[in-house]
Structure formats: C-alpha cells, structure tokens
Amino acid sequence: LVRQAMLEAADYRAALDRYENEKKKNPATATAPPPRDLKKEALLLVLERKIPVHIHVDQADDIMTAVRLAKEFGFSKLSLAHAEESYKVADELAREKVTVVVGPRMIVYDDDNRAVNLADYLHRHGVEICIMTDADVVQQPFLRSQAAIAIKYGLEPAEALRAITVNPARLIGLEKRIGSLEPGKDADLVVWSGDLFDVRQEALHVFIDGVEIYRSARVDGGVKK
C-alpha cells in the first residue's frame, strides 16, 4: 500500500510538471492541471527529500520492506518506531543508516524466549537509537525511566543520554538548535540532585532560554517565576 501510494504521488508530480511545461510553452493550449490532491502533495515532500520518513513497524519482514522503500524512493532519512524485531536485522539497519526509536517496550524476547535489551543490542551493532515513551502508552514524564530500564540491562548511560537528547534532535533536523549544551543553542536545561537516571533524584533547577523558571525548595528556599 505504501509503495502504491508513493508511485501514485510520483505520477501526480509528473502530471504537474507536464502542465507547468505546457503552460510555459503556450498558456492558451495548455491542458488543465490535475485535480489537487493534498495526500499526494504530502508524499511529494518525501519524494523531494524535504522531510524525513518515520514508520511504525514491528516485524522483521516489514522492517526490511521499509528499508527497501527508502532505497527505492530515496528517502532523505528513515526512522522506525517500536521495531521490536529490529534486532534480527540490526546489521542491515546499521548499513542503511536507519534510526530506531525504541519503546515503549524496552525489553523484547527472541524466538527462543530470551530477553533482548533492544536499545543496547542495536547500539552495539552500530544502529543509531532514540528512546521514547509512546505517550500515552507510557506517560511522557517517564522518559528517563524508559532510559533507566535500558541502562539496567546493559546500555551505557552516556548512550542512553544521547538517545533522549541529541539523537532525537538530529533525527528531526534540529541538532543545531537543541539536543546538547553548546554555545548558540537553546539554553533549556534541568539540573538534577543526582544521577539523571536514578528516579529517586529530583529537579533542582529548570532553565528555559537561559532563564531560571523553577528552583527546588532544597535550594535557597525555592522559587518559581
């Protein structure tokens, strides 16, 4: 179905191009443009490599279908949500530079019922990962808890941090503005009382655009602006 939709969008683009060429040559004899189709116009953004493609998928065969579509139609960037069987094709995903957004299930089970820490497995096989909650399946405030689960079962804390900061920023093309602490980027940050991935810790300071908007009562009596 996806491939058919992409082919129809390509045909729509060709019809638009023919109309524009005819209109330039002789406006009086140009045929009517094709009826406007907003769905096809949305897919043109993909064909013209103006937006990335994010696909919800789980099974390995469907994952590889998505990879083939990306190669056939020249997607600018492909990312996969959930992708619970991505460990079966991790090497292929790494080779094609596909990002996997892991969650809400952080631990999956292989065909022999062995636990697989999906985020860690993919990272060790060279796949760029992000971690999500899939809100409202897991509520958004529990994002760091999702990352903590991956850490508990083997993912390096530094990679878990990247998976909820700079990696997703890069995935949506905003890495020059957000995702890490660097001069010139948005100064939005939280200072925690300890390890970010220890759920017993609390936020001490919250800064938005460099302005402190929250201070815990544990710090100088606390302040909210």
PLM segments and residue spans:
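His/Asp/Glu-enriched, well-ordered alpha-helical/loop segment
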Residues: 52, 91-94, 103-106, 111-192, ...
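Polyanionic/metal-chelating signatures
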Residues: 1-77, 202
